[in-house]
Amino acid sequence: MLNVEMLSTGDEVLHGQIVDTNAAWLADFFFNQGLPLTRRNTVGDDLDALVAILRERSEQADVLIVNGGLGPTSDDLSALAAATAKGEGLILHPEWLENMTRFFAERGRPMAESNRKQAEIPASAEMINNPVGTACGFAIQLNRCLMFFTPGVPSEFKVMVEQEILPRLRQRFTLPEPPVCLRLTTFGRSESELAQNLNPLTLPPGVVMGYRSSMPIIELKLTGPAEQRDAMLALWPEVRKVAGDSLIFEGTEGLPAQIARCLQERQLSLTLSEQFTGGLLALQLSRAGAPLLASEVVPAQEETLAQAARWAAERRINHFAGLALAVSGQENDHLNVALATPDGTFALRVKFSVTRHSLAVRQEVCAMMALNLLRRWLNGQPLASEHGWINVVDSLSM
């Protein structure tokens, strides 16, 4: 198996001033290509430290993806570190300098003299095109390791990995078939409870069951080599059975996207009224392309369950919408969720059984609960369901 590693650079990454989303993306992308990362390192803007780790990893890794440090400023040191590690100088590539000049001219801006630095790469390096930015990438061979140097801007990094680096790896190495990863997401069950019920399952050789908890959901992943695909598919119904009523979607589509697709397929429009969730439902559904006719965020106010139901029903009629979803304000750890449909209006009154979580987490949970209520109606399931540490204390149909 190839030993594939990543090196993230920059003081802001090392000190936690920005989240290293590039590392997470690359790990997931390469895993799905059959190239799981074996190590990740982070080094700040220190030339000696960069040179040292490049030389160290060149004796251990087959492939190293270096990210960041290709900008025009004095703390962008990756090209110099690569040249120093190789014992050679930097050379200016006139074709990339011309490309940068054209890049700025097309945007009506002069190119700063400092940008010339981005056209300088180690003398023996292969230049790698960056079709969406000014920092060219490059590749070098250092000892046993093929190293790729990439810009830190996520949009540039992803394009370079997908369009330039992965094809080179496929040409250079015989890559394994990507692993099989079956996923489902649950809402309202604890990780320990799910694990207790899944542990008795006999997994095929080389197959592992994984859990990813991200409040308010838990993702279950069955991952294994491609040759175990049939055995994994045969086992998957048992995993679904354990998830049971808490299963909200399979794959990676996400609940808002699933709901948006269902609404579009059934030609149903939706209107929203939010108090406690503060527009979170509107944000999630609009990003997913749901057919929203109207959405509002109103100040929290005391209301009974019947009032919440009537409000949702009135919103649906007044906006000529197929559906209306309303979330009330929170009062003494209680709140109401109401869904008005062509078949009638259904409302739940719920109570938080755990209050230690932050406001943001509770808003996320309530938004998910409201989306799940909508999902269950769209799928023809009973609307009332428990939600872990949110207890249903009353319900109403009208």
Where are these regions (language model features)?
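Short beta-strand elements
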Residues: 138-140, 211-213, 335-343
